[in-house]
Design a protein with these regions (language model features):
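Chalcogenol-based redox active-site neighborhoods
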Residues: 1-185
Length: 185
């Protein structure tokens, strides 16, 4: 299982290349990216609700395809724990649309396409030399604070165990009140 970085903010935030992603306790940078040619999704749209933010290098690569398919299978558990899932890569919206359709994905894939990698850079999750995002995961609470992050080697599927542990901890800390937390009063 992946270590929980909520207690050890720097435990998994750097890789052998020296890449450094934002750690637990940091404010998650807001963003607004296209999910379709005519629709944008913003982190602010999820205020009051936990978010699993999954940066991945590229649609259609075997590891990314397996990772996103796994998260699609685990999506009901993420939602049971009060979280929504968002995938982000530098691929364009048409590529995402085809990829999501082929994989039957039921969560938004956002295009960090123009300016290329700007959102990934704000999270410390961009690989300049290759022009792709790192394989980086973030669990963000309803107040927009990163509660867990993990940087995986680019060719390794990080799985879902670390995400689930972080969400369970967040869910327990919130006193099991995350469901409906974003509802207007």
């Amino acid at each position: 299982m992946t270590p929980d970085t909520a207690d050890r903010p720097d435990a998994t935030n750097a890789n052998h290349r020296g890449a450094q992603i934002l750690g637990a306790g940091a404010q998650a940078p807001n963003f607004s990216l296209h999910s379709t040619p005519d629709q944008r999704v913003s982190l602010e749209d999820f205020r009051g609700q936990a978010v699993v933010l999954a940066f991945y290098p590229a649609d259609w690569s075997p590891v990314c395809g397996d990772q996103m398919a796994l998260y699609n299978q685990v999506l009901p558990e993420f939602r049971r724990l009060g979280a929504e899932l968002i995938g982000v890569s530098v691929d364009g919206v048409w590529c995402h649309t085809a990829f999501a359709g082929a994989r039957n994905l039921h969560f938004p894939l956002l295009a960090d396409f123009e300016p290329k990698g700007a959102v990934a850079r704000s999270y410390g999750a961009y690989r300049d030399a290759e022009g792709v995002t790192e394989r980086a995961l973030f669990v963000i609470d309803g107040d927009g604070v990163i509660r867990w992050s993990h940087l995986s080697p680019i060719g390794v599927n990080p799985g879902a165990d670390g995400i689930l542990e972080a969400l369970e901890g967040l869910h327990q800390h919130a006193g099991h009140t995350t469901a409906g937390a974003g509802a207007p009063s």
